[in-house]
Amino acid sequence: IFSILMDTDCILYLENGEVFSGFSFGFEGEVLGEIVFNTSMTGYQEILTDPSYHSQVVLMTYPQIGNYGINNEDNESGSCYAKGLIVRENCKYPSNFESKESLDSYLKKNKVVGISGIDTRKLARIIRGDGAQKCIITKENNLKKIKEKIKKFPVMKGNDLTFKATCKDIYNILGDKNEKKVFVYDFGCKHNILKILSEKFKLNLIVGPCDTPPEEVKKINPDGILLS
């Protein structure tokens, strides 16, 4: 571990024992989570705010991430759900007319730990072969301590994250007053799904928490029910 850290400042350690050295960016700290990968060339802002990535460490396989910054339009929810971000190269100076801040700044603000300088293609092949597994991004250089932290960290399987991703109260999204009314059970629903239903299909949406009682939905008397 000491030799691996010689020219870098943090490591990514996988549950299977694989070690990758890199450079920290975003929030300064340590993060444990389930590692998953995404092959999209763009859309990192949508991915970070997608409730389906709750408590996961996301690996982006595209070589450069952050080149168009962060804007006010592309969030898929009201929160940043990913716990960590792994990239080959973090673009420090984004260029886009809609950009409001850099990826680095956004991660700091939302307490998301990032690591760059990683061979992301190699890492993706490992995950593809071995499946999702626990990982840690850390500046710790004691391998024994790292292994203990990984071992103690709970597995994602069977962990109910729905209540952490759902909305707190019922709210309405108006489409066309002449169109049908749909009740949406929010199990971590993305904003874009609601946007398409209301703007493209003109549906009137009533979005409720995942534990909304059936009796409450019956009072609303919707034309349809969507589980999302």
Please place each PLM-identified region on the residue numbering:
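RNA-binding accessory domains that recognize and position tRNA/RNA substrates
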Residues: L5-K200, L205-I220
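Short glycine/threonine-rich loop/turn motifs
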Residues: L226-S228
